[in-house]
Amino acid sequence: MAVGWSIAALLLWRTSVPAGLRLPQVDARAYFSAAELERASDFETFLRIEWPLATVVLFTCLVFMALRGPRLARSTGLGPIGTGIVLAVVTVTLAAAASLPFALAGQWWDRRHGLSRSSYGDALLELWLTLLVEVAFTLLVISVVMALARRFARTWWIGAGVFFVALGVALSLVLPALSSLELEPLRRPRVAADARVLARITGAEDIPVSVEEVHEETTRANAYAFGLGPTRRVVLWDTLLDGRFSRGEIRVVLAHEFGHHTREHLAKGLSWFALFTFPGMLVLALLTRRRGGLANAEVVPYALLVLSAIQLASLPVENVLSRRYEAESDWVALEATRDPAAARGLFRRFSTTGLGDPDPPTWSYVLLETHPTLMQRIAMANAWGRAEGGGR
């Protein structure tokens, strides 16, 4: 089993970025003014304080519920699965309530820096809707996992792993189809023409490009690829098309997102999820077994604590994989557009418009960054240009 896991991981790890590619050293001061670097650093510093504090508060809530679980379980009288669901919902709700001050602080910080146009009421509504989704998801997951644990005391984790992987695949197919109902077609003739050309170059002719209207909520610019099979799509935020980004920079974005699809990054992400889900479920089973197993409702809050700890511990690995695929999409974009100058301009503008730190601290990079740093991305553009004989 370990050999099969290793072979699968090795195959998924491979990318089209040349194995011997060496990124040149780049100095952020060559691309950003001192004022731009200071502003981005100041903005990110607040977020780097907020995240550890929010994480500590979250785990405090989870530990509290894990300790109180047995007493609360005895007071419900709803049966094992019903009691487990109640304890899980209470835990999720408590965690959401504890996160509220941090969410509002983040909204205040974004508004202070001109990045958010949403009101505090909008932020509260979004948190409420998120909580409803989390509660519904919790109802489903606890019902299934506890039923498996009660039926298969020692091997339930295998069935739970299958359930989570199947759920991940289903959501990857269904959610994009539902989300596409709120998207707009790409009505910019020049951008649409560029998209068709780049889709042909990258082999993504069958993937549509849509626009998501977010200008009333944020000034940030972004784009993303999502979906599997018939639901695959590239989505541009309308803020990317508001005149702040050049035609060449938008072409780089399009090629990058097409690269995610043509290099099967979303499917590979699900494959990694499967590879780590089963060991994660085994660890959960072993740790909860010491407290009587997940067949017992009183263990549910403790199980949520363990799952959260596993997720926190896996963040560095998840980010390494994400950054690797993002780098490959950058390489695809450079190969398709053959315009390293536009790529450098895009990465620079991402910082000046979104206040992203071009060169974050190492701990932040390891724990929080899903993309290569902006300086690493600029360095890759330089490396591509050098490999092509100077580039542009």
Which residue ranges define each predicted feature?
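Polar-ligand-bearing catalytic/cofactor-coordination segments
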Residues: 2, 9-66, 73-294, 308, ...
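N-terminal signal-anchor/signal peptide hydrophobic helix marking the start
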Residues: 295-304
